[in-house]
């Protein structure tokens, strides 16, 4: 590759990539700690909670979709999904017109746990939120991190970002804050699901 053709120098590339790497590492250490503390009362790990989150949003996600949107290996997605199934939080199924792929759905018990976790969220125990508060005080809103989202889009693709945006749009539209806690709106409860399933599912037979 002819580096002279690049619109940046090797030095600029190194400085940027290492800034991103080291800042991301520092940020993840804080995020990981807070995330683990949040879900600890429910005896879940981060991958398991992420799977519940994706299953709630997609309401019929394949294992490959769980792996893609959860940024984990397919075997990791499958193994943790099986553990969640054993606890009664997920059920495995097949689409009637797609017998090759295995899909997962939240059970009523799984949805109940997912909603309880959301309700238990405590902003005072989130270090990243605390770190962003000076910016909120200055600008009247939290950072929209559009530059980071653009980078992620170019790494993982439009599908990834579409599901990412949809999941937070669902939270925005279906939940409200009541007395300092997250609560699902009554009309969303009556609707019965977050995202409409486009193809019928049938349970897997053991």
UniProtKB/Swiss-Prot annotation:
InterPro entries: HTH_MarR-typ, HTH_tscrpt_reg_Hpr, MarR/SlyA-like, Tscrpt_reg_MarR-type_CS, WH-like_DNA-bd_sf, WH_DNA-bd_sf. One of its GO terms (biological process) is sporulation resulting in formation of a cellular spore. Keywords: DNA-binding, Repressor, Sporulation, Transcription, Transcription regulation. The keyword Ion transport does not apply. Residues 63-86 bind DNA. Residues 13-157 form the HTH marR-type domain. Residues 178-206 have a biased composition (Basic and acidic residues). GO terms for molecular function: DNA binding; DNA-binding transcription factor activity. Homodimer. Negative regulator of protease production and sporulation. PANTHER family: DNA-BINDING TRANSCRIPTIONAL REPRESSOR SCOC, TRANSCRIPTIONAL REGULATOR, MARR FAMILY. HAMAP family: HTH_type_Hpr. This is HTH-type transcriptional regulator Hpr. It comes from Bacillus licheniformis (strain ATCC 14580 / DSM 13 / JCM 2505 / CCUG 7422 / NBRC 12200 / NCIMB 9375 / NCTC 10341 / NRRL NRS-1264 / Gibson 46). The lineage of its organism: Bacteria, Bacillati, Bacillota, Bacilli, Bacillales.
């Amino acid at each position: 590759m002819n580096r002279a053709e690049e619109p940046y120098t090797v030095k600029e590339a190194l400085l940027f990539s290492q800034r991103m790497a080291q800042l991301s590492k520092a940020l993840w250490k804080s995020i990981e700690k807070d995330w683990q503390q949040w879900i600890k009362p429910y005896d879940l790990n981060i991958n398991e909670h992420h799977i519940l989150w994706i299953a709630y949003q997609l309401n019929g996600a394949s294992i490959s979709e769980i792996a893609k949107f959860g940024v984990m290996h397919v075997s990791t997605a499958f193994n943790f999904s099986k553990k969640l199934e054993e606890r009664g939080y997920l059920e495995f199924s097949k689409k009637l017109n797609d017998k090759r792929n295995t899909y997962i759905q939240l059970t009523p018990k799984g949805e109940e746990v997912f909603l309880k976790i959301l309700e238990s969220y405590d902003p005072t125990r989130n270090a990243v939120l605390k770190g962003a508060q000076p910016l909120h005080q200055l600008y009247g809103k939290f950072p929209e991190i559009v530059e980071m989202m653009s980078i992620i889009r170019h790494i993982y693709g439009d599908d990834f970002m579409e599901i990412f945006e949809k999941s937070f749009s669902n939270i925005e539209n279906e939940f409200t804050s009541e007395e300092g806690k997250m609560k699902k709106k009554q009309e969303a409860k009556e609707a019965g699901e977050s995202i409409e399933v486009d193809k019928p599912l049938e349970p897997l037979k053991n």
